[in-house]
């Protein structure tokens, strides 16, 4: 009940118990406001009703310096965050408070972060390709406009860099609105991303940042904030979708959302499930993923980085995410070890729309032929390791040579990695990608050594680099 006042009776880490009059017990997911002695406001979300007017709540910020006996006020509704054009070009925390030092947000509407997904009859599914400008993704695992894509990888294989490049490409080439949720990742990366977005420009007047909303709940935040920050970003994205816009939602990293849920679950005293995860893992993931959907008014296209613990794809966290996705981009450590970035595994990455009726017969033919050549090269590796390349048939030697060129040609200079590679980023349209790989498969560049294919845009760049070296 709004305005009901209770008293904090127990504090265990970020979980606290508060006692209210029994006929005024706050509802599940209601936000409680607590004024600390230092004048700061602490918000906690009700998770359990224990009976007798006692509720268990999870704090959204640190409980340091909090004492038993302080007053807790029931706001009567879930955490509500600002939505609308005033949020563009701003940086928020889980509560929707600006953290960029730019003053109060100009918002006329606030929405609760817990909302039902759109009704089934309002949802819309399209099978339209979404161009990213990244060759390996556009050819092998094309994104669906209004679909969900997961970027899977272990530690340090380049998930965040791929996400950052997608943000930069999409903002420049597609001129849509983007919402970025930093969930439990490094504050340094978040800071770098904000500065890069401010520097990148769509045109003379408009920065990429001016069309982006950023919401952060980083590694140092309590688990409650990390668990709810994705819902805050989702609520802001839903507003633009419902206004008829096409929105991009980036989540880095969805595994940290699961990890925060696991921490909260343990603090609430729930019995853990397999590998120590929360028993509600599937439900929590479903509640978030079902809201990331397109309606007849507008679309939300989402790209989610998924950390894979110890490179184990059978771990319950990445396995639960898999079932919700239209396309999966798998980053492989062995490819990164060869110095090929983005380290996408073209044999393990998949897309629902790699279908001749959607992408076209030529795109489908080239993609499948590239995969066939790479698979044959993979099958031959044991023979090569034992007997050497010289013992292969002429056909197999040609397959190996082309496969090695394809592997290297899948690498690409990124705009956001310019300071590492020393090369300006390249955006390659899908038509050029398909044409370049078709020419490579046809044997047009069999005479060019494989090292010239590394970190190039289109095939013409490879030919130019080769001819320049011969002068």
Swiss-Prot record:
CDD domains: ATP-synt_F1_beta_C (cd18110), ATP-synt_F1_beta_N (cd18115), F1-ATPase_beta_CD (cd01133). It is a peripheral membrane protein. Its EC number is 7.1.2.2. Keywords: ATP synthesis, ATP-binding, Cell membrane, CF(1), Hydrogen ion transport, Ion transport, Membrane, Nucleotide-binding, Translocase, Transport. PROSITE patterns: ATPASE_ALPHA_BETA. InterPro entries: AAA+_ATPase, ATP-synt_VA_C, ATP_synth_F1_bsu, ATPase_a/bsu_AS, ATPase_alpha/beta_chains, ATPase_F1/V1/A1_a/bsu_N, ATPase_F1/V1/A1_a/bsu_N_sf, ATPase_F1/V1/A1_a/bsu_nucl-bd. ATP binds at residues 153-160. NCBIfam families: atpD. Belongs to the ATPase alpha/beta chains family. Produces ATP from ADP in the presence of a proton gradient across the membrane. The catalytic sites are hosted primarily by the beta subunits. This is ATP synthase subunit beta. It comes from Roseiflexus sp. (strain RS-1). The lineage of its organism: Bacteria, Bacillati, Chloroflexota, Chloroflexia, Chloroflexales. The gene is atpD.
